[in-house]
Amino acid sequence: AGYDMWEGPYGNWGSRKYLLASLDQSLKRMGLEYVDIFYHHRPDPETPLEETMGALAQAVQSGKALYVGLSNYDGATMQQACAILKELHCPFVINQNCYSMLNRTIEQNGLLDACAEEQKGLIVFSPLAQGLLTDRYLHGIPADSRMRTDGRFLNEKQLTPERLQLLQKLQAAAQARGQKLAQLAMHWIL
């Protein structure tokens, strides 16, 4: 939870009302009684961290989630959340953050060190940078691509001439290794 679930107040971010209602809706859609991990997908600048973590703990205490995960938190905020969840005796086990050859933010924002210090797991999303680290965009933007038709997470501004040149250099490096660009990107992550 953390992104748009419905229009209007409390349809987004990290309030108790939003988190618990979105969990209930997700469980109903999936036909499940509980999820293994309930993620909060982004820190909420308007809601106190204590409220957000309290809602996650309530989800576990009610039996609707076995564990808690966080996504898109930096190191310092994750450690604050971890301290709150420890006080609430809530099992926080994993972080999920964007990481790729093109997005290395977690190396600079303290998350890697915080995960090691707190002994929390880390799983990445978008290791292919929304498809940029594939052969799809090596020669520009295809007419039928998400970049042209959607643009919410991948848009034309992200494929600058400099970025395209970098992708072509990475493609050459991948070919020198007998790989496709996507394979090189996945090996880099591992």
Please give the residue ranges for each predicted region:
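Beta/alpha (TIM)-barrel catalytic core signal, keyed to glycine-rich beta->alpha loops juxtaposed to Asp/Glu
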Residues: P45-L190
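A short, structured active-site edge motif that brings together acidic residues
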Residues: A1-M5, Q96-Y99
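N-terminal binding-site loop/beta-alpha segment at the start of enzyme catalytic domains
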Residues: M5, E33, Q61
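Active-site mouth loops of central-metabolism enzymes
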Residues: Y3-L20, H41-T47
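Active-site groove signature of glycoside hydrolases
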Residues: L27-T47
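Short, small-residue-rich loop/turn micro-motifs
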Residues: A1, Y34, S126
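Short, acidic/polar
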Residues: N12-M30, M78-C82
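Residues in well-ordered alpha-helical elements
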Residues: K17, E33-D36, E50, A182
